[in-house]
């Protein structure tokens, strides 16, 4: 398996259309069993890997993540010496926005993914990367899902957007879902937002990766464009490269406002208009959005 940065590969596990054809058996990881009380029996090696992952990333995000994410981290109060248990996370999410996390296998289908979001349940694969894949991983693991995404689910506007997104996706056709996937990619996974005159990060695909966090916030290579829903829906992406473009919200309330619009009408218009020219070189057997 090629060594591609974690943050640009997570789409294989959730939102890449190509993944719909892949068997769960193709992943080398298997989610750990969850008890009737929602507890997972993590071992000491896994606790040690979690400690190294979270302590490293805490330093990277503290000046680069948006305030809503940092506030959410404070609410979650994730332990650094051990992996958190699902009920600990659910108590906070339920209190703040009515969400919960739902344990799932390493790879799930589009149908399952959208159904969970529509029910205010965020899918969390109950496995953690091995030490030899500390920085490179194909599937979205427990660290990516919990550290990358759960903090933002404490924010009402983000939570409302994600809920409506799930409802729309649950009813969408496969082609419509491919356009919706681009919306998710450039918001929930790789979204940026303006905050007091600075560009900050709220996308979990960025915030769970030190390399992508630095690249998205400081590199002069990628474009950073004002968020435009029609542009977003028509922008191709690849999961095996650092992103050539990010879309920047003026503020997080725009996510809620977007959730109140007729998003599917915008999807249909984007389908009629077609995709924009890609900002990356073609690749044989590429996995593109």
Curated annotation (Swiss-Prot):
Tell me if Oxidoreductase is a UniProt keyword of this record: yes
The keyword Iron belongs to this UniProt entry's keyword annotation: yes
An example of a GO molecular function for this protein is: phenylalanine 4-monooxygenase activity
Question: What InterPro entries does the annotation carry?
Answer: ArAA_hydroxylase, ArAA_hydroxylase_Fe/CU_BS, ArAA_hydroxylase_sf, Aro-AA_hydroxylase_C_sf, Aromatic-AA_hydroxylase_C, Phe-4-hydroxylase_mono
Entries under SUPFAM superfamilies matching the protein: Aromatic aminoacid monoxygenases, catalytic and oligomerization domains
The UniProt entry's sequence similarity note says: Belongs to the biopterin-dependent aromatic amino acid hydroxylase family.
The name this protein carries in UniProt is Phenylalanine-4-hydroxylase
Organism equals: Vibrio cholerae serotype O1 (strain ATCC 39315 / El Tor Inaba N16961)
């Amino acid at each position: 398996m090629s060594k591609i940065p974690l943050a640009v590969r997570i789409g294989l596990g959730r939102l890449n259309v190509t993944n719909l054809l892949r068997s769960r058996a193709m992943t080398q990881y298997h989610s750990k069993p969850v008890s009737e009380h929602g507890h997972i029996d993590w071992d000491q090696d896994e606790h040690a890997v979690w400690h190294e992952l979270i302590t490293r990333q805490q330093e990277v995000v503290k000046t680069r993540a948006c305030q809503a994410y940092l506030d959410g981290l404070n609410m979650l109060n994730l332990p650094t010496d051990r992996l958190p248990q699902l009920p600990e996370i659910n108590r906070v999410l339920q209190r703040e926005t009515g969400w919960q996390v739902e344990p799932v296998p390493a790879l799930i289908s589009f149908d399952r993914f959208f159904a969970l979001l529509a029910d205010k349940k965020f899918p969390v694969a109950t496995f953690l990367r091995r030490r030899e894949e500390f920085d490179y991983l194909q599937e979205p693991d427990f660290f990516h899902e919990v550290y990358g995404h759960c903090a933002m689910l404490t924010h009402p506007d983000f939570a409302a957007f994600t809920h409506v997104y799930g409802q729309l996706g649950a009813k969408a056709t496969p082609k419509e879902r491919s356009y919706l996937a681009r919306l998710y990619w450039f918001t929930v996974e790789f979204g940026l937002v303006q905050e007091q005159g600075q560009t900050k990060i709220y996308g979990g695909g960025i915030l769970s990766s030190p390399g992508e966090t630095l690249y998205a916030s400081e590199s002069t290579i990628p474009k950073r464009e004002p968020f435009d829903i029609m542009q977003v829906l028509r922008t191709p992406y690849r999961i095996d490269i650092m992103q050539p473009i990010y879309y920047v919200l003026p503020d997080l309330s725009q996510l809620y406002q977007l959730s109140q619009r007729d998003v599917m009408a915008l999807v249909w218009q984007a389908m009629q208009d077609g995709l924009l020219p890609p900002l990356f070189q073609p690749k044989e057997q590429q996995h593109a959005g």
